[in-house]
């Protein structure tokens, strides 16, 4: 656990990406899933995997391959050629619950009396420790430390008393508390499920006579598929050759209770994705325009910290009239500092990830736009880099509000004491990162960013849609009582 004074431990961690596919013509899907995972690589860089099965072959035979590293590091052409099957699921992972090991890589494959299921999960369950203990008391033996295995066990258990695989998925999901976007393959069906709050994105696509369920629309574009629609919060969708797309909305909540993670629009998702009908790129442009209106400053250049700061920087430029320009060269072969599990890895990444174009900033007053400041390392280092390259002033603008509270739903913000904004004023943060001025996006602007969609902003406000646990997102219990302020809004 990072101590209170280690605000320079860098920013957040999220998350995972899922991609499932069923080809009704019987064509192999492993290679297409591979390209889909490539498009989702930004959602997780620790491990990845693919599991496929042949619906015309023996019921329950699943071929699975997974490993640590990036998609192109784990899979070789010979791996994909051996994976014969017309239905399958893939996953890219960052560990928000459970350690970063090959055993915890997904998809999970579970053999049980009704056959075999493969599961990929994005999110975090706040009641996973209790559910896990309940299963262990009934004889379950876990092979991983991740909450996703709890989901798989419950689906298998519920299948014994259900008429169908999709009913088992729905009944299992009704036990879960937290965030989840699931893709599950049964021997003859592709199933997707999204939690009732809609924390994590999930959508459906179609290519020729095949269907896809995946985290982001950019993955559909990559494989030449057509977007069909989003999976709705609380929905279980089932795809089969006999019935096409079926929908079960039993778990759906009233729309005003939905709680999409706003950080998908601010940072997590690729800018070329659309989530619940809203363009991620357009949202970031709006954020930049709002910053220019609410936190103006005289300057010569507006620039974004690649990649997620670029669109907001362009929006700031459009609204302010200050020229937009490129000030950073990014090393494309270094993963995001956001998605590095160890502090030593994060700091090394910051040092080699970016270089400043001296010709672009020397002698200029620079406005630097970034998506967030969580612990502070990246902002502090980049401000110094700009000054070393000759910038006369560095004004930092952040396209999100200050992070003040932990997240329990799949984003690694484990303790308030680790957050640079905890018990500090904006002026104090500005001094710590070495900027001439600092401005954050106002909390009231977030819903406008998401075009009025119901969103969740608990990491900024401390208001949760459900009672938070006395544990961090990696399952480590706190001894102290949870602050009253942290509790959900009534």
Predicted regions span which residues?
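Conserved short alpha-helical segments that host acidic/polar catalytic motifs at enzyme active sites
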Residues: 1-233, 238-299, 305, 393
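Flexible loop/turn segments at secondary-structure boundaries
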Residues: 96-97, 127, 191, 199-200, ...
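Secondary-structure transition/capping motifs at alpha-helix termini
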Residues: 140, 161-162, 296-300, 318-325, ...
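A conserved beta-strand->alpha-helix junction
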Residues: 144, 149-152, 324-335, 432-450
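PRPP-dependent phosphoribosyltransferase catalytic core
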Residues: 173, 188-189, 224-226, 230, ...
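Extended, hydrophobic alpha-helical segments in both membrane/secreted and soluble proteins
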Residues: 302, 309-316, 320, 324, ...
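Short, glycine/charge-rich flexible loops or terminal/linker lids adjacent to PRPP-binding catalytic cores
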Residues: 321-366, 376-377, 404-412
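Mobile, glycine- and charge-enriched loop segments
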Residues: 355-369, 373, 398, 474-481
């Amino acid at each position: 656990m990072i101590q209170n004074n280690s605000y320079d431990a860098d920013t957040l961690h999220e998350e995972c990406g899922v991609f499932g596919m069923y080809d009704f013509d019987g064509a192999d899907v492993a290679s297409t899933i591979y390209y889909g995972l490539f498009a989702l690589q930004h959602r997780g860089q620790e491990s990845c995997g693919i599991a496929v099965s042949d619906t015309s072959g023996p019921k329950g035979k699943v071929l699975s391959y997974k490993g640590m590293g990036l998609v192109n590091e784990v899979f070789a052409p010979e791996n994909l050629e051996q994976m014969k099957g017309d239905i399958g699921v893939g996953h890219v992972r960052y560990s928000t619950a459970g350690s970063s090991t090959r055993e915890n890589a997904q998809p999970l494959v579970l053999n049980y009396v009704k056959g075999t299921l493969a599961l990929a999960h994005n999110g975090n369950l706040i009641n996973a420790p209790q559910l896990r203990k309940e299963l262990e008391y009934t004889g379950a033996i876990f092979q991983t430390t991740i909450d996703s295995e709890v989901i798989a066990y419950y689906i298998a258990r519920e299948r014994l008393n259900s008429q169908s695989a999709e009913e088992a998925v729905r009944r299992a999901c009704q036990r879960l508390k937290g965030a989840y976007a699931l893709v599950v393959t049964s021997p003859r069906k592709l199933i997707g499920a999204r939690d009732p709050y809609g924390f994590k994105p999930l959508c459906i696509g179609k290519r020729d006579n095949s269907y896809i369920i995946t985290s982001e629309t950019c993955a559909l574009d990559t494989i030449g598929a057509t977007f069909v629609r989003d999976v709705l919060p609380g929905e279980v969708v089932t795809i089969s050759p006999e019935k096409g797309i079926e929908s079960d909305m039993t778990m759906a909540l009233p729309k005003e209770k939905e709680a999409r993670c706003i950080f998908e629009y601010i940072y997590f998702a690729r800018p070329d994705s659309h989530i619940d009908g809203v363009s991620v790129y357009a949202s970031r442009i709006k954020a930049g325009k709002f910053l220019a209106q609410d936190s103006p400053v005289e300057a010569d250049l507006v620039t974004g910290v690649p990649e997620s700061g670029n669109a907001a920087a362009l929006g700031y430029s459009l609204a302010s009239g200050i020229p937009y320009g490129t000030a950073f060269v990014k090393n494309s072969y270094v993963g995001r500092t956001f998605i590095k599990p160890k502090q030593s890895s994060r700091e090394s990444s910051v040092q080699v990830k970016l270089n400043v174009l001296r010709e672009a900033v020397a002698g200029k007053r620079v406005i630097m736009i970034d998506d967030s400041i969580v612990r502070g390392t990246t902002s502090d280092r980049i401000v110094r880099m700009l000054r070393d390259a000759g910038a006369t002033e560095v004004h930092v603008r952040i396209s999100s509000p200050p992070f003040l509270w932990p997240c329990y739903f799949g984003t690694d913000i484990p303790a308030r004491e680790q957050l640079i904004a905890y018990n500090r004023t904006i002026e104090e943060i500005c001094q710590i990162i070495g900027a001439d001025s600092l401005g954050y996006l106002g909390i009231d602007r977030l819903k406008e960013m998401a075009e009025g969609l119901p969103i969740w902003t608990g990491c900024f406000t401390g208001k949760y849609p459900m009672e938070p646990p006395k544990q961090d997102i990696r399952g480590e219990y706190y001894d102290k009582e949870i602050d009253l302020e942290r509790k959900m809004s009534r």
